[in-house]
Amino acid sequence: LISGDLVVDDRGTLKFVNDFDFKNVKRFYEVENHRRGFIRAWHGHKNEDLYVYVVQGSALVGVVDLKTEEIQKFILSDKKPRILWVPANSANGFMNLEEGTKIIFFASNTLEEAKKDDIRFPYDKWNIWNIDYY
């Protein structure tokens, strides 16, 4: 995780992640699900790194190492700016925890390169999606 911060003053809010280097990024896209609790998973690439940033709301993000099937879970939120690195040879998925959650994915490959390297799995292959809401 690449940590950021936010500053609030009389003008508004500034969110930033100053330690993120865009040199490997060739494209980006924003995803917003229609409702809280919707799952988009599992999608991976053998040769593409992804960087995940929650612009609005919060999400449970899962990352699976495709060699070992080790699973990692992260909660990303607009209240604590951070960028999650999803390395090549991994699958990822997410479930938004709030209505209106928006996530930006930064990718190291062009769309044409990514299409040649696309790996998909059913959303419940690694079922990490149970959350206790308080």
Question: Language-model features: where?
Answer:
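Non-catalytic, conserved peripheral segments adjacent to functional cores
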Residues: L1-R82, M95, E99-Y134
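Glycine-rich nucleotide phosphate-binding loop and flanking beta-alpha elements
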Residues: N92
